[in-house]
From Swiss-Prot:
Mn(2+) binds at residues 162, 164, 233. The lineage of its organism: Bacteria, Pseudomonadati, Pseudomonadota, Alphaproteobacteria, Hyphomicrobiales. NADPH binds at residues 25-28, 53, 136, 138, 217. It comes from Bradyrhizobium sp. (strain ORS 278). This is 1-deoxy-D-xylulose 5-phosphate reductoisomerase. The keyword Manganese applies.
Length: 407
């Protein structure tokens, strides 16, 4: 039994739903809080967590009268308590407090803690059978089989919160699994879609951060420029919907209006369209199994005029090929792919490698890990985190060599 409900067969949501937002001060959290702000009569906030933005977290806690608030940095607990003095809001700090927030009795949990740190809190929500809007890539990229099996066993409901997987989630409800031929994830192509490979190699940080359509954080914007993000989304789709790599295609769509498509056996293709606004997929998750009124602009196709599509260029964007390779390799390779990419992006931001070296470092790390013979099935969150740590060490060790070759 899948933890992703591909048919609308769940009871209508309660009049007032209790909500926990893990990662409330990040970009996904900000969009979520904006939606909650628009319907105070419908939602009650149970818990909020943040990384280190005490001022922003405390402001949200006061505004929404949250019952519990946690900050990831244990050293900031005193500041958080001071910021919430006199409110009666319970406070916590550190990993255990973030997990406690996730385990509290909320009907709906937004899992938007970034990085591997988001895995254990998401599992805490899953283990109590919550409805979890999943915006953390690592839960699937690093521990996909294990995470989805655990969700199914606990009776949890996993709702994809990012735009592409939410689009597939909506389109998949038009048919049955045995009728599916393939899913198609769209990609804008990023700022380097038409650049020559040799020019992409030399791209600057400023150029990589100029995404043509989406407003996102620094790391994911760079991932979009390299199309590593699309590779990660291919991996996520495989685990979310139990798809083989051959059942997942990527199509470059510069306008970012069509977010995902599903082809069925009768050759019908069902697509989900919407403006490039993260509040749209989050609103779908927040209202599911109903639909709520969202604040986003309505889609005006006449104004847009033209929608174009093209095949991805694997020479221009080798990261996409590496994602498929790691997915086919299995047994922890996707965890290595993700960890090595994070090390590579940080090195690029820090000025230690060229943009073109990001994919080379990821490939070198995957090859080094494969030669080590450490491949083993994942059976726990600790297994996934151990592989993640090992891959980061390998990538860091290979970094000087990759940087020297590019200089």
């Amino acid at each position: 039994m899948s933890a992703v409900p591909l048919r609308n067969n769940k009871a209508i949501a309660a009049d007032v739903r209790s909500i926990t937002v893990l990662g409330a001060t990040g970009s996904i959290g900000d969009s979520t809080m904006d939606l909650l702000r628009g319907a105070p009569e419908r939602y009650r906030v149970e818990a909020l967590t943040g990384n280190s933005n005490i001022e922003g977290l405390a402001k949200l806690a006061r505004e929404f009268n949250s019952r519990f608030v946690a900050v990831a940095d244990p050293a900031r607990l005193g500041e958080l308590r001071e910021a919430l003095a006199g409110t009666g809001i319970a406070c916590g700090a550190g990993e255990s407090a973030i997990i406690e927030a996730a385990a509290r009795p909320a009907d709906w949990v937004m899992a938007a803690v970034s990085g591997a740190a988001g895995l254990k809190p998401a599992l805490a929500a899953v283990d109590r059978g919550a409805t979890v809007a999943l915006a953390n890539k690592e839960c699937l990229v690093c521990a996909g089989d294990f995470f989805m099996q655990r969700a199914a066993q606990a009776g949890a409901c996993i709702l994809p919160a990012d735009s592409e997987h939410n689009a597939l989630f909506q389109a998949l409800s038009s048919g049955n699994r045995e009728e599916l031929v393939r899913v198609i994830i769209t990609a804008s192509g990023g700022p380097f879609r038409t650049w020559a490979p040799q020019d992409i190699e030399q791209a600057t940080l400023e150029q990589a951060l100029k995404h043509p359509n989406w407003s996102m954080g620094q790391k994911i914007t760079i991932d979009s420029a390299s199309m590593m993000n699309k590779g990660l989304e291919v991996i996520e789709a495989s685990y979310l919907f139990a798809l083989s790599p051959d059942e997942i295609d990527v199509l470059v769509h510069p306008q970012s209006i069509v977010h995902g498509m599903v082809e069925f056996s009768d050759r019908s293709v069902v697509a989900q369209l919407g403006a490039p606004d993260m509040r749209i997929p989050i609103a779908h998750c927040l209202g599911w199994p109903e639909r709520i009124k969202g604040p986003s602009a309505r889609l005006d196709l006449a104004k847009i005029g033209t929608l174009t599509f093209e095949a991805p260029d694997f020479e221009r964007f080798p990261g996409l090929r590496l994602a498929y390779d790691s997915l086919r390799a299995g047994r922890g390779a996707t965890t290595v792919f993700n960890a090595a990419n994070e090390v590579a992006v940080a090195a690029f931001i820090g000025g230690h490698i060229r943009f073109g070296a990001i994919a080379r470092l990821v490939e070198a790390t995957l090859n080094d890990w494969t030669r080590s013979g450490n491949q083993a099935p994942l059976s726990s969150a600790d297994d996934a985190i151990a592989i993640d740590h090992d891959a980061r060490k390998r990538a860091a060790g290979l970094l000087p060599q990759i940087a020297a070759k590019a200089s």
